[in-house]
């Protein structure tokens, strides 16, 4: 049966995902940045209270995936922490300035991760050649690759995703970016073994007093009074589609 991974940005979201049938959680912070390394407090709380597999993301900042030596050193320290806390896997990715997988750094990541399953995240979609990148990641021992098929969303990139799956002896290809209940069946029919979804909604903040003339974000258009939350009904609907597909 296809596996459903839900991207969660809080303890509350992780609990919602678990209750509604998620098979695995990608744990992140900072949804507006596309996901950054969670805090120690969140990591420990989730490790203590969530029973399904949780893979934290290791990403020190937003933007591209070419990191300074200092940033990369911090990533290795975060990987060691995630390993010490007992998580079964992690999610990360590093590139060279030319858009190739940074194999030298991936070797260090894999060594730091040890027995943990490593997912190479959507840095893959920024690679110059996805097929060369997939071969390199297979050589590195990466367990899976999260990809939209190098398109804005996985529905647009489905043909490339199918080509990547056809490569055979390679990491698991997990489709992600815009995967929802209304298009999930297309991925299942295409033979995708794992899907990744935020299954989320933005909710208004409960704050009554609001200083509308001030933003805490560098993006002055950012809505300071909305919060991301995993929608349990969406997770349950997607899991139901997967179960019914398996029963065919």
Swiss-Prot record:
Keywords: Cytoplasm. Pfam families: CutC (PF03932). GO terms for molecular function: copper ion binding. GO terms for cellular component: cytoplasm. It is found in: Cytoplasm. InterPro entries: CutC-like, CutC-like_dom_sf. It comes from the Bacteria. Homodimer. PANTHER family: COPPER HOMEOSTASIS PROTEIN CUTC, COPPER HOMEOSTASIS PROTEIN CUTC HOMOLOG. Belongs to the CutC family. This is PF03932 family protein CutC.
